[in-house]
Amino acid sequence: MKIPDNFLYYLSLHEDCNERLLARAGNLTPEELEVCIHPEIARIKRMVFAVLGEAHRMKAFVRLQPLGARVLYGFFKPRHKIEEHICDYFARRNAGIIVVLGNGSECWISLCLEGRIWRDHGSGMAITLEKLKTALHCSEDESSEDRSNVEGLWQVYYDSQYCPERKNLAAFKRHMPRRDQEAAGLRLVQNKENVTLDNFSSGE
């Protein structure tokens, strides 16, 4: 993994980042951070990579579900402070759709319109979704049906990816650690034979 030019941004999102580390890193170029072996600089590099890694995995792991036609939401409780970053990512990929990521205590809201991002930070997911459902006049039947269909498809996909019989299971677990599964609200089956998504969808 290469150190990005905006590595200070990712460093600032690390759970253990502070002003002193940011000031120290601010005197470095990406190239210097890449090759320097000083203990503190090496730590900064690890912190940047930790945030980049979690952000990369969460983009793949977070499951978005519809609330009517104008809202997508998903459970999200990461280790680092990447909530707004990931919410904006999904908003850009779903322009014109309100994206809500969060958990029982707080949530992040992003909307991309004409290339601009509008953001908000709310309380728990349930309260925020209820407010959106009321404001957008989403019917309970419509929301429940959409949610059920999407939950089923996502679970089928993730189940099909988790196969203990994989030849390189250790590598798979490194890329999909349990901590990240829980951060994205995933529930993976533990004892499935090596089958495809089509097999799961057809009930085989």
Regions found by a protein language model. Name each.
Residues 1-204:
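Extended, well-ordered protein cores
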